[in-house]
Amino acid sequence: MIKVGIVGGTGYTGVELLRLLAQHPQARVEVITSRSEAGVKVADMYPNLRGHYDDLQFSVPDAQRLGACDVVFFATPHGVAHALAGELLDAGTRVIDLSADFRLADAEEWARWYGQPHGAPALLDEAVYGLPEVNREKIRQARLIAVPGCYPTATQLGLIPLLEAGLADASRLIADCKSGVSGAGRGAKVGSLFCEAGESMMAYAVKGHRHLPEISQGLRRASGGDVGLTFVPHLTPMIRGIHATLYAHVADRSVDLQALFEKRYADEPFVDVMPAGSHPETRSVRGANVCRIAVHRPQGGDLVVVLSVIDNLVKGASGQALQNMNILFGLDERLGLSHAALLP
């Protein structure tokens, strides 16, 4: 049984991690931390978890207790894992970080986007970017895993087949992405209030979103060179979900794009390439660790449109983190993650 610790268990990704781990036959949550809720039972804060964690309580972070775990997940704001990851790694504990702390390979670039110096630059060389569809073999040997963000997951999975094959003009990529409000976190913000977000949709961070360098980094690795990416995120009046509409110029009109995508993801348990002509819906992935993709070439032209949908809290965060844990410990990748999406 894998002994699990969770740092930061009161946000949406933390409680989603608890929900998924409750169904995992080979993992047990030993420690969950929250400074503000120390002493509160998990089941009292989240009644959906009653019967699963009736005795588990939030506690103040304690390096010794966390270091006794086999793996520790960080479901925290950026900067927290910087301070604790090194000590846990020294104790022999594997670290899976759901924050952005170790996603970017360049410490200076991280500092520019997150407005503070990187707190653990010495760990960046060994941090493995936890996108299993790209880095599965590296994940198997990792000590420190950086779980990709939600927009980066949907965007990279949608564009990687075209870039790996050298088919797309990498200098003219567009990612037009929509997110549910849970992507903004559980903290109280005016823009997340029902009266503000309901029955409305808006673009934001058009000048530059923190996920832009992460997406670009992944696409550069796929293409083997520089990329030019325009990334525009939008906030939509739904709780969960990411819908990415991706545009790429593909001059070769003879290539069978459907076959290309099906071949690339044929052995991926959590990527579903839908039949030609499909339009994947966010509701089709709600609560599930799956990315559904459809590829189109409108009017047979050079502009290819890829539609990619995920649940931002599952494949875009906690589910992908658990998928990484399964790989890391040599388990069936689907363990605890094979449940169907919720409909309606």
From Swiss-Prot:
Gene3D superfamilies: Dihydrodipicolinate Reductase, domain 2, NAD(P)-binding Rossmann-like Domain. GO terms for molecular function: N-acetyl-gamma-glutamyl-phosphate reductase activity; NAD binding; NADP+ binding. It is an enzyme of class 1 (oxidoreductase). The active site is at C150. Its EC number is 1.2.1.38. Belongs to the NAGSA dehydrogenase family. Type 1 subfamily. HAMAP family: ArgC_type1. This is N-acetyl-gamma-glutamyl-phosphate reductase. It comes from Pseudomonas aeruginosa (strain ATCC 15692 / DSM 22644 / CIP 104116 / JCM 14847 / LMG 12228 / 1C / PRS 101 / PAO1). The lineage of its organism: Bacteria, Pseudomonadati, Pseudomonadota, Gammaproteobacteria, Pseudomonadales.
